[in-house]
Amino acid sequence: MKEPSKNRIVAMIPARYKASRFPGKLMKDLNGKTVIARTYEAAVNTELFDEVYVVTDSNKIFDEIVNEGGQVIRSKKEHECGSDRIAEAVENMDVDIVVNVQGDEPFIDKNSLAKLLKVFEQEGAEEIDLTSLKTPLKDSDDITNPNNVKVITGKDDFALYFSRFPIPYRRDTSANVTYYKHIGIYAFRKSALMDFYRLPMLHLEAAEKIECIRYLEYGKKIKMVETSVKSVGIDTPEDLEKARKLLS
């Protein structure tokens, strides 16, 4: 059961069947359950949310969540990104905080999510509309992998930029640099999510295919919260095999 909070918090899991890098990945078997079913179950089991929903335009995914006894909303429109999809779903909901949980993240860490949500209850929280997670990267292959979105932040932990390219660029190879991976889980105030939904995509978001860049392009702030927990997202068939081994 979710602990009492002054905020009504819902988790929304945008689920698109035709993923460009790994089509149909959310319906792939992950040791007896589909990827999307495991992600939904993991979100519910954190007990951090008043409600958890999958939001999809796919009949296959819709039926899968219904058959699993979960809550699912059918998208009415085509959307460029997951945050747009969930904004449509929550537009008429009575909710304060909306957490965007990626459908291909079946290993959700409760403590990391709790840290994310705690930001909205701390002093000065009224100035924060959107928070997200970052985790250090050490392996050079992970740093250069374009499927791992990198983020750089200022001294106050607000995001400066996100990229699939390793940032910052180390012109001075002796410089002490820590690279951070962006974990694609966002916690929005509902008002900020609806603002995001109404803002047209600009060229940097379109080039990188990273939805949170839109927020930066319009001069808004994203508070980043560091976690040591490594995200296990499923972007490729190889990732799926790694996930299967983790569960076996």
UniProtKB/Swiss-Prot annotation:
InterPro entries: Cytidylyl_trans, KdsB, Nucleotide-diphossugar_trans. It catalyses: 3-deoxy-alpha-D-manno-oct-2-ulosonate + CTP = CMP-3-deoxy-beta-D-manno-octulosonate + diphosphate. Pathway: Nucleotide-sugar biosynthesis; CMP-3-deoxy-D-manno-octulosonate biosynthesis; CMP-3-deoxy-D-manno-octulosonate from 3-deoxy-D-manno-octulosonate and CTP: step 1/1; Bacterial outer membrane biogenesis; lipopolysaccharide biosynthesis. Its EC number is 2.7.7.38. Disulfide bonds: none annotated. GO terms for molecular function: 3-deoxy-manno-octulosonate cytidylyltransferase activity. GO terms for biological process: CMP-keto-3-deoxy-D-manno-octulosonic acid biosynthetic process; lipopolysaccharide biosynthetic process. Pfam families: CTP_transf_3 (PF02348). It is an enzyme of class 2 (transferase). Keywords: Cytoplasm, Lipopolysaccharide biosynthesis, Nucleotidyltransferase, Transferase. GO terms for cellular component: cytosol. It is found in: Cytoplasm. The keyword Nucleotidyltransferase applies. Activates KDO (a required 8-carbon sugar) for incorporation into bacterial lipopolysaccharide in Gram-negative bacteria. Belongs to the KdsB family. This is 3-deoxy-manno-octulosonate cytidylyltransferase. It comes from Christiangramia forsetii (strain DSM 17595 / CGMCC 1.15422 / KT0803) (Gramella forsetii). The lineage of its organism: Bacteria, Pseudomonadati, Bacteroidota, Flavobacteriia, Flavobacteriales. The gene is kdsB.
